[in-house]
């Protein structure tokens, strides 16, 4: 029998905020849609995420609407659709929650939603918060590729090595992680700084994203 379709899950993590995870996730989702793929996007910075803003959503929907139906152990299509935001042809977004205090209740809903999205989408992109609750930890553990994002900030290399250890502890092998140095070429983000970040990460897979300048 043919194995069931399971879309790859690509998760962006970092040990410090402001390094560009959300922008990278939004860009990957947009690019995937241009390639004709159905991209599902989860903003698991559940308390204060702003992916909906980056993706141009005027009226964000509350992902906490999935808490009650998830108690049954399965999410029905109408519930999933009601909590979603159709950003563009091929890009659909879920998250964050409207009331930050509900973030800790999202582990089970996220697990159930991710299971459905892996069957119904071509690719799943996940943005995360610096603080990991159960929902983030479970999503990272389920990822097929984990992007460890950093930049030229002073603490970026040290915090990246710590978040790699955390991802390892939830079951992600280092072979599924990539070191992503963002804004390469910007002021203070030269070859030496990028190499320092990559050495601290000690991952065989390395990616550098060039700085786009002030206009981007």
Which positions does each model-derived feature cover?
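Walker A/P-loop phosphate-binding motif and the immediately C-terminal alpha-helix
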Residues: 6-55, 117
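Phosphate-binding loop that captures ATP/GTP phosphates
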Residues: 32-92
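Arginine/glycine-rich "motif VI" loop of SF2 helicases in the C-terminal RecA-like domain
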Residues: 33, 167-175, 198-202
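Cytosolic-facing regulatory segments adjacent to core modules
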Residues: 72-131
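Inter-motif core of Ras-like GTPase G domains
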Residues: 116-121, 132-154
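Well-ordered beta-strand positions
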Residues: 123, 145, 203-207
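Beta-strand-loop-alpha "switch" segments that mediate conformational coupling across diverse proteins
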Residues: 183-184, 196-216
């Amino acid at each position: 029998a043919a194995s069931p379709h399971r879309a790859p899950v690509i998760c962006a993590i970092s040990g410090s905020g402001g390094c560009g995870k959300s922008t990278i996730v939004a860009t990957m989702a947009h690019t995937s849609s241009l390639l004709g793929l159905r991209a599902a996007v989860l903003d698991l910075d559940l308390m204060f995420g702003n992916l909906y803003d980056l993706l141009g959503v005027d009226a964000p929907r509350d992902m906490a609407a999935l808490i009650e139906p998830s108690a049954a152990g399965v999410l029905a299509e109408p519930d999933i659709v009601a909590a979603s935001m159709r950003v563009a042809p091929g890009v659909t977004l879920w998250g964050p929650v409207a009331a930050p205090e509900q973030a800790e209740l999202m582990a089970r809903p996220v697990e159930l939603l991710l299971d459905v999205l892996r069957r119904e989408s071509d690719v799943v992109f996940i943005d995360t918060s610096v603080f990991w609750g159960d929902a983030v930890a479970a999503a990272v553990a389920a990822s097929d590729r984990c992007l460890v994002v950093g930049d030229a900030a002073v603490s970026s290399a040290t915090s990246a090595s710590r978040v790699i250890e955390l991802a390892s502890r939830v079951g992600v092998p280092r072979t599924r992680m990539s070191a992503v140095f963002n804004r390469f070429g910007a002021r203070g983000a030269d070859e030496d700084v990028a190499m320092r970040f990559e050495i601290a990460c000690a991952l065989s897979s390395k990616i550098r994203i060039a700085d786009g300048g002030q206009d981007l």
